[in-house]
Amino acid sequence: MSNSNWLEKILPAVRRPQESRRNNIPEGLWRKCPRCEGVVYRPELDRNMDVCPKCDHHLRISARRRLKLFLDEGVQTEIGTELSPVDRLKFKDSKKYKDRLVAAQKATDEKDALVVLKGALHGEPLVACAFEFSFMGGSMGSVVGERFVRAVNVCLEQKLPLVCFAASGGARMQEALFSLMQMAKTSAALEKMRQAGLPFISVLTDPVYGGVSASLAMLGDVNVAEPNALIGFAGPRVIEQTVRQKLPEGFQRSEFLLEHGAIDMIVSRHDMRETLYRLLANMMGWPPLALDD
């Protein structure tokens, strides 16, 4: 008989209350910051917009969460909900594409990697979209491209501005040329926005790479980024292996890109609503933001 069993028989109550208290603690109550490794109380993190209160690191968040933080509460219309991805090429790598889609849809409760909502910002109507990075790395396939174009079309029809929060690894390789075509398709749609004189603000969050960074994400009238976001085309390890040189400190971080003129401004998540409203107010002729808003 082990010592632990012997103690449990003599003092059974010593162990049971501890187990009971442990079982009463809900899962996910604490979260570890990936930057400072501090442990943060989940409700506190929620109140702080998923920004670490210890080091100000902007944690990755879902598309729905991001749009909820950005748009006014109230009536919202989702665009492109009837669109679902199709495995036209019967693509298979280590896993069938259709199986990857099923797994991603189950994990995220989304049909694909872009959510588009028509809503309001401080009472002014606009269209906003956000990439869901947890859906196959936020990769852009046919559905993502079509939803984005439909968002643009709504803006053109109703004379509204467009805001896009990008978080993507790039074009979806499982759709091959169908995916690459979305780069041209979304870029052409944004040219129509430009010709119509309607503003498009691109917000680059962590991370934005590949075909998304090489198309719609960098085509904003104003390109905004969250602090410390990774932004580029190829990843830093790939670049280092190609050029056989050590990259500068902070290479591809939003602060580095701002310093070298690749983006226009860095905005904290806490200030995103007010900052983007003021930008759009100047472009759209909206009324100035009231002090109590």
UniProtKB/Swiss-Prot annotation:
Protein location: Cytoplasm
Binding positions for Zn(2+) per the UniProt entry: 33, 36, 52, 55
Cofactor note: Binds 1 zinc ion per subunit.
Keywords: ATP-binding, Cytoplasm, Fatty acid biosynthesis, Fatty acid metabolism, Lipid biosynthesis, Lipid metabolism, Metal-binding, Nucleotide-binding, Transferase, Zinc, Zinc-finger
Subunit structure: Acetyl-CoA carboxylase is a heterohexamer composed of biotin carboxyl carrier protein (AccB), biotin carboxylase (AccC) and two subunits each of ACCase subunit alpha (AccA) and ACCase subunit beta (AccD).
Role noted for this protein: Component of the acetyl coenzyme A carboxylase (ACC) complex. Biotin carboxylase (BC) catalyzes the carboxylation of biotin on its carrier protein (BCCP) and then the CO(2) group is transferred by the transcarboxylase to acetyl-CoA to form malonyl-CoA.
Protein name as catalogued: Acetyl-coenzyme A carboxylase carboxyl transferase subunit beta
